[in-house]
Amino acid sequence: MAASTSTSSLSVVGTNLSLPPHRHHRHFHSPSSISTRIRTNRLFLSSSLAFSSPRDARVVHAGLGLRRNTPDVWKHYSSVLSQPTAPVPVRQSCTSCCLASAKKRRSNLPRFVPGAFFDSSSFGLSKDKLRHASVKRVQLPHATVGPDEPHAASTTWQEGVAEKQDLSLFDSELERLEGFLGSELPSHPKLHRGQLKNGIRYLILPNKVPPTRFEAHMEVHVGSIDEEDDEQGIAHMIEHVAFLGSKKREKLLGTGARSNAYTDFHHTVFHIHSPTSTKDSDDLLPSVLDALNEITFHPNFLASRIEKERRAILSELQMMNTIEYRVDCQLLQHLHSENKLSKRFPIGLEEQIKKWDADKIRKFHERWYFPANATLYIVGDIGNIPKTVNQIEAVFGQTGVDNEKGSVATSSAFGAMASFLVPKLSVGLGGNSIERPTNTTDQSKVFKKERHAVRPPVKHTWSLPGSSANLKPPQIFQHELLQNFSINMFCKIPVNKVQTYRDLRIVLMKRIFLSALHFRINTRYKSSNPPFTSVELDHSDSGREGCTVTTLTITAEPKNWQNAIRVAVHEVRRLKEFGVTQGELTRYLDALLRDSEHLAAMIDNVSSVDNLDFIMESDALGHKVMDQSQGHESLIAVAGTVTLDEVNSVGAQVLEFIADFGKLSAPLPAAIVACVPKKVHIEGAGETEFKISSTEITDAMKAGLDEPIEPEPELEVPKELVQSSTLQELKNQRKPAFIPVSPEIEAKKLHDEETGITRLRLANGIPVNYKISKSETQSGVMRLIVGGGRAAEGSDSRGSVIVGVRTLSEGGRVGNFSREQVELFCVNNQINCSLESTEEFISLEFRFTLRNNGMRAAFQLLHMVLEHSVWSDDALDRARQVYLSYYRSIPKSLERSTAHKLMVAMLDGDERFTEPTPSSLENLTLQSVKDAVMNQFVGNNMEVSIVGDFTEEEIESCILDYLGTAQATGNFKNQQQIIPPTFRLSPSSLQSQEVFLNDTDERACAYIAGPAPNRWGFTADGNDLLETIDNASSVNNNGTKSDALQTEGAPRRSLRSHPLFFGITMGLLSEIINSRLFTTVRDSLGLTYDVSFELNLFDRLKLGWYVVSVTSTPSKVHKAVDACKNVLRGLHSNGITVRELDRAKRTLLMRHEAEIKSNAYWLGLLAHLQSSSVPRKDLSCIKDLTSLYEAATIEDTCLAYEQLKVDEDSLYSCIGVSGAQAAQDIAAPVEEEEAGEGYPGVLPMGRGLSTMTRPTT
């Protein structure tokens, strides 16, 4: 179960100033997942306006952001067609509790850092502008505001504190401006709010993405903050017992519904994602509501279920007790030391969890689970609002009525309590509001039980100016599992509810200011040895914590920590004192407006779950909820009133707790917390004790603030990377043209009407696939895939490809343009680009807007990377240092060191699948890494795919101009020279290993892995299984459905002869095994909280593997491993059932249907369509996908299972245990270590992120 953190970063109530939630599809990667795809903290060409939260910033950064893939220890692309999309969980899962970020979901909409800046924009407060703004405001549709949510976070300053405003205007203009800015923002026109007589509130929002599905979430306003001293963790326990004990919820699983739950400080949420109807056209909403009613208000606290969940939670507690979790706890403990938030973490206390009986748990439920303390959200393809309201009343109307006592009369419909009990309900889409009548006999009823007026019910100590005597000294958390230095400086203030245009204007000005700071700091990656790894400033509202927190987070190598602090605070002070320049104001204001315009155009593409999350968080914070169009119009209305002086004044207030540190006028930091290692590696001396004191930290801050400062110079931003005259010369010289797509076909253009896919090939050998899609308005994505990847590294050049890709990204330059100029070009043109390396491929992916020639700008950038990339020694030094840090951090991670030891054993020590060692890194030169990367960029080894809302003429013009003029001709010869990876010969003494890690706390994990074929049926020992199976099928034709895929028109190829046979059947098998592992190892035996099965099916390399990841306790981990092995092998004796196969099909087909309108998903479908190294990928792999799933039989799935090597001689396992028993240290030698996901030892950005617990399924 996973907890949710509701941090809304500069959340602007639907205005799109806040980053849209990035959907993780409720798929949480546990530590055991060990997916080592790294999203680096050091971004390449990253222009960012995303300051909601540093962790959001990575989703949105424009520029060539390096999304680097290290050797993926387990997981390759999850899709059957190799698209790197986040998978949707296949079964219900209960995600509960701990300090996790509410950013757990993000929108899957393409999100750009907004771009081109209007030089003609004026920011003066002219009468025309004010009048124009007023018109914009009154044209916006309004709906009912709904009840005044009493659970919104407190926004009250302590007495005597007031906001300062200084506007130099004539009185008449000021009066007009004040009148406009003081008016309320509009409300979402389609959002319907209401309340039943028993107090349950409901919100209904029609939304057709995805079609024929809806989200139903029941939010109970109780969390860990409401627990007494002897109840720590009981809210989470109830969530587990109520959710997993519901029989009605279980019955929904056969309909294709998914369910989940989570617990946080301030609330517990149960949610169901469901089809709108069954196959028999029965309405599913009543059944879903009935299940939520049972879960929330009528759970069975059976002793057997309580014991099951007690074991699961204790396992979860150990599993999530990573060093990241412990760091997050430290941050929250110091940030909120004055209230219960510092000591009520949702996971609870082990000694208390072991003790509670059913009576104790039931009493907490009775105290807090009552109708007036719950809110129901329904968002989805709901057509009939009155019918939905009636269904809600039918299911929940009588709940709790008989149990409530006492009444207090209220006669005024305008009183606070009347507003609470008798909200308005908007029934028209145009926003006309009416009162929904309620039973008059119940209008006077007030309930004995009422939710807290403020959620969470805690009192904060705000960051106010004060004497240095009240300054808390920096706190230091030191631990042997930490690798790098990090420090967080916090400022805590009340939430400013965004209700008026003035509130929105302030948020806009903050975003502009912080955008400038982020860009400036990112430009400091110039020296060979930069003093910091990352510097992030986060200014965000938190509904879960009931406050707004500004956080400066600095991470660095331990040896550089003092310089890192000096640089960061110096830059903060410089921005605070001099402010942003006029050019920066113009650039970032216009960028934000363009981003807002883009999201407004995407209003019909926002998923139901993203809309629901946004509404829930906005209500918790007291923000006005608007739709994307309203938000954009409101933003336009206030943008014309923004001035440079005001932006700098508002921004300075955000930064003064750091910039004026030590002065009486400065707000006192809420906390300063440094998290540091106990020992560090020093060249020539080995491991040495790391010493640091609070005084040294304070001195470093003061030293940085005392350094002289200079104003920021204006940068010249290129309008084009390829001049028109240069382009014309290239076209004259190289004569770009299309040639026949293949030698067998004379046609130069192949268009498939059914899929809309067009295939082309350029004269320089580059194949191109494109698809015109209107699903994402004025948006496009493009991916260049280059074959080879790390597999092409020679035995004398290990690490050359992965370090080379990193070197290219570190430099960030093309042609004669500096890194800063390229970054700003990306901002101006709303380009987001990532560079990635895997075992098989190098890829560049671009997201762009079609507005203002954004696609042409993206193609210009791609052209420059191909033709004029710049390689520098200092960039290589930085890349080498990054991987050296990765390597040294492995022994400090239980999961990564355990996984690494297994991988080394299974793949016979092949370093291409692990991090490069220090000796390999030392051998690399700039020329060797450049050659390793760029030698793969030749025409017949590349493929470009584009999907977007463009025309045929637009896309083909860009293809010819910028790809056709690239000197990509040549043949990639390395394919024959690549040494194919192999599995270690078995049996081997390394097939069963253990790792022990010194730690203060006990934890355990294990991995089980073995060989599998690749996606197309090839194996490491040279067999072509597809050919074998197809021959057997033709000889032994028994008439099963798999032998002929009947569709409209002529029958298509049989499944067993189809190239995707293994892609389809292995996907189904994965779902089935995952379900069995959960049912057996987790639910029946109680040996783990988290267990999963994943397949890594390569496309180019002729092998694959599976891995089972399991977490447990040291006392149970061996039994858990044995149980997992039994499940893996049990499919022989306990065959697959029709019900299991049907559920797996439904899950995968639902995932396909949910993603099919996404540009990014189509980009994955197009991958390798013309790749010479993936010859079996053809159009049928896309066109037949649905029918292939439907046609698969149990026999087909069993054939796939036979190709998984699960026998004792083929299977590898490694068990990792951490604790204080140093004598048991059996960890792998450090020379073999490799790194995992993220900056190892560098803490994840954002409070509470790592403390999210894992799904139960």
Curated annotation (Swiss-Prot):
Keywords: Chloroplast, Hydrolase, Metal-binding, Metalloprotease, Plastid, Protease, Transit peptide, Zinc. It is an enzyme of class 3 (hydrolase). Changing H236L: Abolishes endopeptidase activity without affecting transit peptide binding. Its EC number is 3.4.24.-. It is found in: Plastid, Chloroplast stroma. It holds the Pfam family Peptidase_M16_C. Residues 1233-1257 are annotated as: Disordered. Transmembrane segments: none annotated. Residues 1-142 form a transit peptide. Binds 1 zinc ion per subunit. Its cofactor is Zn(2+). Its main location: plastid. GO terms for cellular component: chloroplast stroma. The active site is at E239 (proton acceptor), E309. GO terms for molecular function: metal ion binding; metalloendopeptidase activity. GO terms for biological process: protein processing. Zn(2+) binds at H236, H240, E316. InterPro entries: Metalloenz_LuxS/M16, Pept_M16_N, Peptidase_M16, Peptidase_M16_C. Cleaves presequences (transit peptides) from chloroplastic protein precursors. Initially recognizes a precursor by binding to the C-terminus of its transit peptide and then removes the transit peptide in a single endoproteolytic step. In a next step, pursues the cleavage of transit peptide to a subfragment form. Belongs to the peptidase M16 family. This is Stromal processing peptidase, chloroplastic. It comes from Pisum sativum. The lineage of its organism: Eukaryota, Viridiplantae, Streptophyta, Embryophyta, Tracheophyta. The gene is SPP.
